Amino acid sequence: MTLKIGIVGAGGRMGRQLIQAVYHTEGVELGAAFERVGSSLVGTDAGELAGVGKLGIKVSDNLTQEKDNFDLLVDFTRPEGTLQHLAFCVEHHKNIVIGTTGFDDQSKQAIQQAAQNIAIVFASNYSVGVNLVFKLLKKAAKVMGDYCDIEIIEAHHRHKVDAPSGTALSMGEHIAKTLGRDLKTHGVFSREGITGERKPDEIGFSTIRAADVVGEHTVWFADIGERVEISHKASSRMTFANGAVRAAKWLSTKQEGLFDMTDVLDLNNL
């Protein structure tokens, strides 16, 4: 049975890539596409918007009107919008794939609570490569983390609105958890002026915003005399879109629960 996917933020950079990914993936089809109320894109053909040709699906600004046209929602928008879409999914018992970043703790709790009623994949990054890097970081932290300086450097395009990136924070959380540290206590997100010497248990973050960088992350495990770097560079948003569609197909068989790409890719068994 073909899975019908609804995509919110269809006119954005990721939204268009998601439509393309759905179009080129077997076993799924675009059921609905959404934009915010007042958008000039409402009423346009979603396929033409994404460059895959006419699909006969008009961009809508009303999830309720289209609720019978899709089985599952994919959301890469902003936290305030995603929480509204999440409430809709709970009300109408539709699963959701969330790629939005920048949530505060209260919003994350709302997602956890919603997962008692529907199935959710919530990940900071849907790239297969990045999620493999998460696994490698935990292994490196076990071997080197207690005696190395750990620094996370991330770069994204000038339009990204949150910093550090959700992926960088996830990297820090994986490392901190492996080392028995609390990232809220040990994470250092800004250095300026006379900061004093670096504390040995810090996990540092550096952020770059420039031009059209899709996404780059590098983690340093730096010791005196040597440094190990683990890096991932994305050259196209299609890697994230394809991963999100893969997650949607995997999620379609689930009833409730909160999952991430580790579950989708079965990385715990590596």
UniProtKB/Swiss-Prot annotation:
InterPro entries: DapB_C (IPR022663), DapB_N (IPR000846), DapB_N_CS (IPR022664), DHDPR_bac (IPR023940), NAD(P)-bd_dom_sf (IPR036291). The keyword Iron-sulfur does not apply. Gene3D superfamilies: Dihydrodipicolinate Reductase, domain 2, NAD(P)-binding Rossmann-like Domain. It catalyses: (S)-2,3,4,5-tetrahydrodipicolinate + NAD(+) + H2O = (2S,4S)-4-hydroxy-2,3,4,5-tetrahydrodipicolinate + NADH + H(+); (S)-2,3,4,5-tetrahydrodipicolinate + NADP(+) + H2O = (2S,4S)-4-hydroxy-2,3,4,5-tetrahydrodipicolinate + NADPH + H(+). Keywords: Amino-acid biosynthesis, Cytoplasm, Diaminopimelate biosynthesis, Lysine biosynthesis, NAD, NADP, Oxidoreductase. The active site is at H156, K160. One of its GO terms (molecular function) is oxidoreductase activity, acting on CH or CH2 groups, NAD or NADP as acceptor. NAD(+) binds at G9, A10, G11, G12, R13, M14, E35, G99, T100, T101, A123, S124, N125, Y126. One of its GO terms (biological process) is lysine biosynthetic process via diaminopimelate. It is an enzyme of class 1 (oxidoreductase). Its main location: cytoplasm. Its EC number is 1.17.1.8. Belongs to the DapB family. Catalyzes the conversion of 4-hydroxy-tetrahydrodipicolinate (HTPA) to tetrahydrodipicolinate. This is 4-hydroxy-tetrahydrodipicolinate reductase. It comes from Histophilus somni (strain 129Pt) (Haemophilus somnus). The gene is dapB.
